[in-house]
Amino acid sequence: EIMPSLVGSEMCIRDRCCVIKKCHSSRLPAKIWHMIVNDQKPAMSGNEHRYVLTLDCPDRVGIVAEISKFLADVGGWILEAAYHADPVSGWFHTRQAVLASSVDMSYDELKKRWIEMAQQIGPDAHAQVTDTAILKRGVILVSKQGHCLHDLMGRIHHGDYPMDVACIVSNHPDMKPVADYYGIPYHYVPFGPGEQGKREAFDVIANIVDAEEPDVIVLARFMQILPPDLCERWEGRCINIHHSFLPSFMGARPYGQAYKRGVKLVGATCHFVTSDLDNGPIIEQDVQRVSHADTEKDMVRKGRDIEQLVLARGLRWFLEDRVQVHNHRTVIFGS
């Protein structure tokens, strides 16, 4: 059996073909076996309909071999294969993308068998299968600053993201023209005075969001702190853009904090939302140089560019099932 390196490896086409030839050729669909023995590849455009299979579990010898055998048995033509084994936690991660037309069964059956295989690997294994033909459903929360919202909506409008925006929710009316331009429902939920007013507003927001059954909730500069119960309810599918290079300058006015400290870099962080403010697992970060001559306003202006880019990357990786979390750390399989 051919086994690629476990740490951060990607299986090349030659290795993939070798693995498939070693594994139960009689079970492969005739069209795929014909291409393999004749050294042919399917015609591809780069936007193929794919099934994405992910798995994370305690590491042990033989997992990659079991995955290879499984994919060969179902006729899966591998388009991407990535692995990571964390030597500290002893945890294994993988993401496999296969050509949907090569699989000799329905999507539901493939999903059932993949989960069954994961359960055989161990009771602590987490597995899922997604179909790239099915757009993920998202809800965007925003306040008065619209630069991240404008950027995301432009990318989605041009078909760059596998995401359908169900609605936009805000505690201000300012971004409604953006929603109207793209034909997206806009829910303005004003926050009343005091903690009771805030709690009532969040209850309304929660009802709106949950009614849409979103795969992802994006806080695109939503300048309100989610209550702990919503953080727990939306755990693992709510992502935020914070305007600093975390863990530096958590909380409010990070650019003001950065200016007072005389930093030479400002940054942004895309992370999962948890009840621990600005301390969720980090998905993506980037920085921009600043100098002693930059004012706080200059830092804010430069930071906006980084915020847009970092959120765009982090959201894309989430939508493409490239993000896995274990022990507060993320594994990001490259695009």
List PLM regions with ranges:
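A conserved regulatory-domain signal marking ACT and ACT-like small-molecule sensing domains
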Residues: 36-136
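Cysteine-centered motifs
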Residues: 17-18, 23
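Histidine-anchored nucleotide/phosphate-binding helix
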Residues: 146-157
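Single conserved hydrophobic/aromatic residue that forms the stacking wall/gate
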Residues: 1-16
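Donor/substrate-binding cores of folate-linked one-carbon enzymes
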Residues: 171-172, 182, 196-200, 215-334
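Adenosine-nucleotide cofactor-binding segment
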Residues: 180, 184-212
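Short internal beta-strands
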Residues: 163-174
